[in-house]
């Protein structure tokens, strides 16, 4: 697993400090899920969000952005398929979201 950032290098621990406490457990679970999808995962910690890519080709498949009480998620399965955008407030549809993220990881080239 590689960690990459453009511009000022930002670590997840620094980023975690800006995530509202109410959102942290859900964000952490989604982050861990993405990191465990494969050895070729690249985590790009940006100013307000984290983007997960498949290998150094930077084919991103998931974008997680915390808000005050939710997580904005963008999922990309292919450059030819429109991006799916979701807002998650609780664990209610977590398994469904994980399935979509895994499908995106599997299908992105």
Predicted regions and their residues:
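Charge-dense, helix-prone N-terminal extensions
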Residues: 1-109
């Amino acid at each position: 697993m590689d960690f990459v950032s453009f511009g000022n290098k930002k670590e997840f621990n620094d980023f975690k400090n800006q995530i509202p406490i109410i959102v942290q457990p859900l964000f952490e679970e989604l982050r861990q899920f993405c990191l465990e999808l494969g050895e070729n995962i690249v985590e790009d910690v940006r100013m307000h969000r984290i983007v997960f890519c498949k290998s150094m080709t930077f084919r991103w498949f998931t974008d997680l952005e915390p808000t005050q009480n939710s997580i904005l998620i963008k999922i990309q399965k292919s450059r030819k398929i429109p991006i799916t955008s979701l807002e998650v407030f609780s664990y209610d549809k977590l398994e469904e979201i994980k399935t979509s993220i895994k499908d995106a990881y599997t299908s992105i080239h």
